[in-house]
Amino acid sequence: MSTPFWQSKTLDQMTEAEWESLCDGCGKCCLHKLMDEDTDEIYYTNVACSWLNSDTCSCKDYPNRFSSGEECLKLTRDKIEEFNWLPDTCAYRLLGNGQTLPEWHPLLTGSKDAMHAADESVRGKIVYEVDVIDWEDHIVLMSRD
């Protein structure tokens, strides 16, 4: 049995398809974050991009997400050192720090079901940005570095 690519390759060595498959589809990166100007601490909100499907935790227009005018960021290998804003459970962040994938990750389980069952996605937890006046009222957790 061969070693899975995420255990045998660095992030830089992965193909585009392998890189894309690391995303568990939790939707947490589609939540707006706030940064404390004094401490640079990052705070997550439950305020989501209007393109996020709240049931599937996927972008409603994934192929065109960078041209839709939204603030969607492309995660690229040359920005790995900037991934501290991603959730602690993000495969890009975990593997970039020499850690392993969580047991519920779709690459290990074959589907998103275990991720949703482990309460690791944003399913049922979001409000859309168009419905929010003060994002500070929607802070849900702080990233842990």
Swiss-Prot record:
It comes from the Bacteria. InterPro entries: Puta_zinc/iron-chelating_dom (IPR005358), UCP006173 (IPR008228). Belongs to the UPF0260 family. This is UPF0260 protein VC_1058. NCBIfam families: PRK05170.1-5, PRK05170.2-1, PRK05170.2-5. It comes from Vibrio cholerae serotype O1 (strain ATCC 39315 / El Tor Inaba N16961). The lineage of its organism: Bacteria, Pseudomonadati, Pseudomonadota, Gammaproteobacteria, Vibrionales.
